[in-house]
C-alpha cells in the first residue's frame, strides 16, 4: 500500500532514465492530452518496461509515464487537477478516499472485456473500498508478514504470531516498518483488535504496546528491511510479501548458508490491493481503458508479474505461471491462512490525526 514503500525504487537514476526514454517527457508534459496518448501515474519499479513498449506498438498510443513514491504524494496531485493523468494506480484505502471526494470516473467495462480475467476473490476484496466495483480494476495484491533468519532463530522459536515481536529473545534483532498504519497494524492485531479501529482507547493501547516494544527494536525501516535481512543484520523483520521472490533469489545467488522464511501471523494481517483507476478529469479516458484492458490480458499480466514479482490477481496469468511460482506460499498463500486478515480502510482525517499523534509519541518516547 503503499504505501507500498518497499517497492519504490523511483529515486534510482536507472529507473528515471529508462522511463523518461519511454515517455519522452515528465510531469510538465502531462498538462496537455491528445487522442493518441495516455498519461500514466504509477509507483516506481511497478511495471515491465517492455510491456509499455508492447502497448505502444499494438495500439499506436504514446505512453507518458510518471512516478509517485507514496499514496500521500499522489493524492494532492490528482486533487489539484493541474496535471491531468488518465490512469493511476493507488492502494485500497486511498481509492476509497478518492471515491468519497469525487475524484474518480466510473470505468466503462465494455471497454475492458479482460476484466473477466480478474479472480472473483480480488473483486470481492475490492468491495471493501469500491463497493460496486465501478471505479477500480485490481493490479497487484499481497500481504504483510514476518521474515526470519533460520541461522539466528531456532525452529522452536520461529515466530508464528505478531505478539512474538515482543519476545525478549529477539532484543536488538527486530526490524519494524517505519510507517504509522503498518506499525499500528502489528500492535492492534496482536491485541486482537481491527487494524481499522477508530476507537481512541484501542489506538492508545496499541501506542503503549509499541512504546513497550521499542527497547527490543533494532531499527524502524522501510526499504532497508530487505537488504538488512539478506545481510544477516537482524533476526526478524516486518516485510511485504512482494519482496519474497527477490529475497529468495538473492539468498540462492549469494550461496548463503541460511534461508529467510516468511510467515503470515495467525492473528491475521494486512491484505493490500493496488488497482488501476481513472481520474474524473482524465482527457483520454478511452485510452486509459485500453491500457487497463491490455494489462488484464493473461500473457501480459504473467510477463509483468515475472518482472515486478508482486502477486497478480489475474487468474489467467496465474494459470500460465511456472508451478514453482504457483506453489510458493509466501507469494500465493492459501485462503485459510488469510481468514483473520483485513484491507486497510480510509478512516477519515480526524482518525488519521489520532494515529499520527500516537505514532509521534511512539517515535519520540
Where are these predicted regions, by residue range?
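Ligand-binding pocket segment of bilobal, Venus flytrap-like solute-binding proteins
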Residues: 175-179, 183, 187, 196-263
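Conserved C-terminal helix/tail region of periplasmic/extracytoplasmic solute-binding proteins
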Residues: 335-365
Amino acid at each position: 500500500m503503499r504505501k507500498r514503500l518497499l517497492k519504490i525504487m523511483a529515486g534510482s537514476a536507472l529507473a528515471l532514465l529508462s522511463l523518461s526514454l519511454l515517455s519522452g517527457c515528465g510531469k510538465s508534459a502531462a498538462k496537455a492530452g491528445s487522442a493518441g496518448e495516455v498519461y500514466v501515474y504509477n509507483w516506481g519499479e511497478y511495471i515491465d518496461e517492455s510491456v509499455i513498449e508492447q502497448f505502444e506498438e499494438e495500439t499506436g498510443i504514446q505512453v507518458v509515464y510518471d512516478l509517485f513514491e507514496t499514496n500521500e504524494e499522489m493524492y494532492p496531485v490528482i486533487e489539484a487537477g493541474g496535471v491531468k493523468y488518465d490512469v493511476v494506480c493507488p492502494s485500497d484505502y486511498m481509492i476509497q478516499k478518492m471515491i468519497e471526494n469525487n475524484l474518480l470516473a466510473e470505468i466503462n467495462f465494455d471497454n475492458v472485456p479482460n476484466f473477466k480475467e480478474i479472480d472473483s476473490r480480488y473483486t470481492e476484496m475490492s468491495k471493501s473500498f469500491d463497493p460496486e466495483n465501478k471505479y477500480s480494476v485490481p493490479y497487484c495484491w499481497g500481504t504483510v508478514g514476518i521474515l526470519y533468519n533460520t541461522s539466528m532463530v531456532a525452529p522452536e522459536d520461529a515466530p508464528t504470531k505478531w505478539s512474538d515481536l515482543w519476545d525478549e529473545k529477539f532484543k536488538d534483532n527486530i526490524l519494524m516498518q517505519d510507517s504509522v498504519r503498518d506499525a499500528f497494524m502489528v500492535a492492534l492485531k496482536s491485541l486482537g483488535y481491527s487494524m481499522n479501529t477508530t476507537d481512541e482507547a484501542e489506538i492508545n493501547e496499541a501506542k503503549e504496546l509499541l512504546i513497550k516494544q521499542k527497547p527490543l527494536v533494532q531499527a524502524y525501516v522501510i526499504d532497508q528491511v530487505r537488504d538488512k535481512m539478506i545481510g544477516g543484520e537482524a533476526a526478524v523483520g516486518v516485510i511485504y510479501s512482494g519482496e519474497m521472490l527477490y529475497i529468495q533469489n538473492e539468498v540462492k545467488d549469494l550461496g548463503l548458508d541460511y534461508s529467510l522464511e516468511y510467515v503470515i501471523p495467525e492473528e491475521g494481517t494486512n491484505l493490500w490491493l493496488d488497482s488501476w483507476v481513472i481520474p474524473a478529469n482524465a482527457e483520454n479516458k478511452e485510452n486509459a481503458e485500453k491500457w487497463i484492458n491490455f494489462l488484464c490480458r493473461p500473457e501480459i499480466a504473467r510477463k509483468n508479474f515475472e518482472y515486478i514479482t508482486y502477486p497478480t490477481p489475474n487468474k489467467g496469468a496465474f494459470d500460465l505461471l511456472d508451478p514453482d511460482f504457483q506453489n510458493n506460499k509466501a507469494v500465493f498463500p492459501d485462503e485459510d491462512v488469510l481468514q483473520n486478515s483485513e484491507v486497510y480502510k480510509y478512516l477519515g482525517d480526524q482518525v488519521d490525526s489520532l494515529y499520527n499523534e500516537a505514532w509521534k509519541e511512539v517515535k519520540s518516547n
